[in-house]
């Protein structure tokens, strides 16, 4: 006989996602699908979506950590767009990367030009005498 009868063959291994294989939280399969559907290239290698998902995950974690620090500095427990704006604009590299990006409800960085500040005069010393 061929040996393919009712003998209990090896059970199929549990499916493991490419994200878990790579140790990522971001979806490698979805990134791969979007790369294929986006007409960026005729073919997409197997490593490209893994690398791209890892880069996206790293950038997201970096921004969220800085935004969480900004929220904590403002004594808040929830990150709002203002905290994202402060985090990105105060970080030199992220500001360069996202320089042309507008964040809705983000506001602006607090900045007063030095010439507009009141001058420190000698009158304070004269009053104390």
UniProtKB/Swiss-Prot annotation:
The modification N5-methylglutamine is found at residue 105. GO terms for biological process: heterochromatin formation. The modification N-acetylserine is found at residue 2. SMART domains: H2A. There is a cross-link at residues 14, 16, 120 (Glycyl lysine isopeptide (Lys-Gly) (interchain with G-Cter in ubiquitin)). The modification Phosphoserine is found at residues 2, 123. PROSITE patterns: HISTONE_H2A (PS00046). InterPro entries: Histone-fold (IPR009072), Histone_H2A (IPR002119), Histone_H2A/H2B/H3 (IPR007125), Histone_H2A_C (IPR032454), Histone_H2A_CS (IPR032458). GO terms for cellular component: extracellular exosome; nucleosome; nucleus. The modification Phosphothreonine is found at residue 121. The modification Symmetric dimethylarginine is found at residue 4. Its main location: nucleus. It comes from the Eukaryota. One of its GO terms (molecular function) is DNA binding. The modification N6-(beta-hydroxybutyryl)lysine is found at residues 10, 14, 37, 96, 119. The modification Citrulline is found at residue 4. The modification N6-acetyllysine is found at residue 6. Keywords: Acetylation, Chromosome, Citrullination, DNA-binding, Hydroxylation, Isopeptide bond, Methylation, Nucleosome core, Nucleus, Phosphoprotein, Ubl conjugation. The modification N6-(2-hydroxyisobutyryl)lysine is found at residues 6, 10, 37, 75-76, 96, 119. Residues 7-19 have a biased composition (Basic residues). The modification N6-succinyllysine is found at residues 10, 96. The nucleosome is a histone octamer containing two molecules each of H2A, H2B, H3 and H4 assembled in one H3-H4 heterotetramer and two H2A-H2B heterodimers. The octamer wraps approximately 147 bp of DNA. Core component of nucleosome. Nucleosomes wrap and compact DNA into chromatin, limiting DNA accessibility to the cellular machineries which require DNA as a template. Histones thereby play a central role in transcription regulation, DNA repair, DNA replication and chromosomal stability. DNA accessibility is regulated via a complex set of post-translational modifications of histones, also called histone code, and nucleosome remodeling. Belongs to the histone H2A family. This is Histone H2A type 2-C. It comes from Homo sapiens.
